[in-house]
Amino acid sequence: MWDNAEAMERLTRWLLVMMAMLLAASGLVWFYNSNHLPVKQVSLKGNLVYSDKKALGSLAKEYIHGNILRTDINGAQEAYRRYPWIASVMVRRRFPDTVEVVLTERKPVARWGDHALVDGEGNVFEARLDRPGMPVFRGAEGTSAEMLRRYDEFSTVLAKQGLGIKEMTYTARSAWNVVLDNGITVRLGRENEMKRLRLFTEAWQHLLRKNKNRLSYVDMRYKDGFSVRHAPDGLPEKESEE
């Protein structure tokens, strides 16, 4: 082998490559364990409307500090994911001295019961928001996405009559009740909800609107008609649609 020039040349190249790799690895280890390359800036990016920016900044300082190679990127990401208003987060290094945090905030569209909110994807999260007039959803755990979908469908139909939804309930027996923004409850039941709601809007346009101040609820669960209650203590009155 020692007399083979070609083999010696290959061995020399291999040794040089190995030395270069060892030097590079040693350099990285030295940088990783040194106080060089400190994080000097944390850049928070995202359209943040509801989040506490001061709290988010404090969260960054808790995890992102020291050598940029050793700073706890994964810990920071997990901490931001636990923050109620944050829907998604991406934390990345920007050499030589910056860590960038890109945040996507939840957009609240409804209240979930008395203590939580629903975002635009139908996810429930616990946060405080002082916004009067938001619709309230009441349903079993795991039904928020379906309730949001139905809310959009129901709202489209009701808006044609100038009506909105104040509260919507999806009962344990899979029945739908809707409280309108004028305080009237519409009972749709557990089947043919859209058909019943359209029948309600027709009845509203031609019959019920003129008596709206006297109505407590309208029950649309009848096959050929509906019933109304004029006062909390009154008796229901059957109205035929035919």
Swiss-Prot record:
Gene3D superfamilies: Cell division protein FtsQ/DivIB, membrane protein fhac. Residues 37-106 form the POTRA domain. Residues 33-242 are periplasmic. Residues 1-12 are cytoplasmic. It is a single-pass type II membrane protein. The keyword Cell inner membrane applies. One of its GO terms (biological process) is FtsZ-dependent cytokinesis. It is found in: Cell inner membrane. Pfam families: FtsQ_DivIB_C (PF03799), POTRA_1 (PF08478). Keywords: Cell cycle, Cell division, Cell inner membrane, Cell membrane, Membrane, Transmembrane, Transmembrane helix. GO terms for cellular component: cell division site; plasma membrane. InterPro entries: Cell_div_FtsQ/DivIB_C (IPR005548), FtsQ (IPR026579), FtsQ_C_sf (IPR045335), POTRA (IPR034746), POTRA_FtsQ_type (IPR013685). The chain crosses the membrane at residues 13-32. Part of a complex composed of FtsB, FtsL and FtsQ. Belongs to the FtsQ/DivIB family. FtsQ subfamily. Essential cell division protein. May link together the upstream cell division proteins, which are predominantly cytoplasmic, with the downstream cell division proteins, which are predominantly periplasmic. May control correct divisome assembly. This is Cell division protein FtsQ. It comes from Neisseria gonorrhoeae (strain ATCC 700825 / FA 1090).
